[in-house]
């Protein structure tokens, strides 16, 4: 009997240790700020932090970094250093598992530090940019308290002190600090009127856009409105009101404000190839602001580009080729990833589809340079294809008299749908991370109003936590469509 009690006590102790090894996180929240105003306002702070940031900020940052598309590497891991431990983040369950015990932060004053380990620096850049914007999304107009900076020295320290399974490419350092906050002031004004002024605040919401972020490879070949092209170019590498170290800041960070991609971004469309500029001629004064195009080659080079890199989507009307000077330099290769995230998010906000092609192999790189007439100093690192969604595979514009609405009830919520014509419908509720949590089987519905009751439980019958969710009603008919509505579940 004594042995049985000892065994039970031992197993209980093991269970307590196992439980202590897992740290739960609060669900991500929706801050309500647009992707554009956050991009226009962001800047990096290197010091002066305090360690007082809420777990909600950490939750949103980790969730955002894990939401970026993979570039088909064999591994991707997120490490978190707090004053307590170093953790390995589990995106599927949104929890942190203790990886190394004890305080191993690079900066003793930081609230937390997040490291990304992937095969390619381009993909690391995608995640780093997502995390930075997720922190800045907590700002308000004119003020903020979440400060951050990607630090290469922190990455070096992490690789020596965090015992990662794979080499950590970069570390985002976060802390609390008074910052200037959100601003929609536009400084990206073309000096020669070759590009219209971009919009620095829109009706979209950063977290909502990110929750549905995905890549596509089938496009309608119709040309894009030029205002959309201008918006994409600005979102990727456009100037902003901030002036770090006397240089005009951009929508993305750059190591020591070196701005490695200056004069190295090219727009490829039906009329020719243009170089994008964000500085006044001759592009050497980094304190200046511009937003213009310079013609490089005339005539349609898109087929030549597709032949040079057959992996590119074949029907995209527009390609943006992001080049670097040194494809072997880690800091340089992070920036195409920063820019790539911006392109994907801005395309999504505009109702467009996009796809990043990376990495670019050396033979593809040389072929692209020859096809587009690029100088030897500009080596393609990422190609972004963008266009309207192909009508054959995604929803067309739905009738104005069709909608999906949400109403609260005593038991939970009621999802009301109005159909202009009959169709087979399937309703799915997703959490903020884009995971399906409750679904109703496909049913044939006539035209008119229909109701779906939801008591807030998942498919397994477990009650789900309060917070934002999204309902999508998929309609299969001659013209398939998708109706979407936000659900605020309250307990």
Predicted regions: what they are:
Residues 21-114, 147, 155-156, 160, ...:
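N-terminal amphipathic, basic helical "cap/leader" segment at the start of enzyme domains
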Residues 4-14:
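Sec-dependent N-terminal signal peptides
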Residues 159-182, 372-390:
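A glycine-rich helix N-cap at a beta->alpha junction
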Residues 419-424:
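Short proline/glycine-enriched turn/loop motifs at strand-loop junctions of beta-rich domains
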Residues 391-401, 406-416, 439, 443-447, ...:
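C-terminal tail/sorting-segment detector
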Residues 15-20:
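Sec/Tat signal peptide C-region and signal peptidase I cleavage site
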Residues 430-437, 469:
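Short, glycine-anchored, charge-dense loop/turn motifs used at functional sites
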Residues 42, 61, 78, 112-157, ...:
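Small-aliphatic-rich amphipathic alpha-helix that forms the alpha element of a beta-alpha
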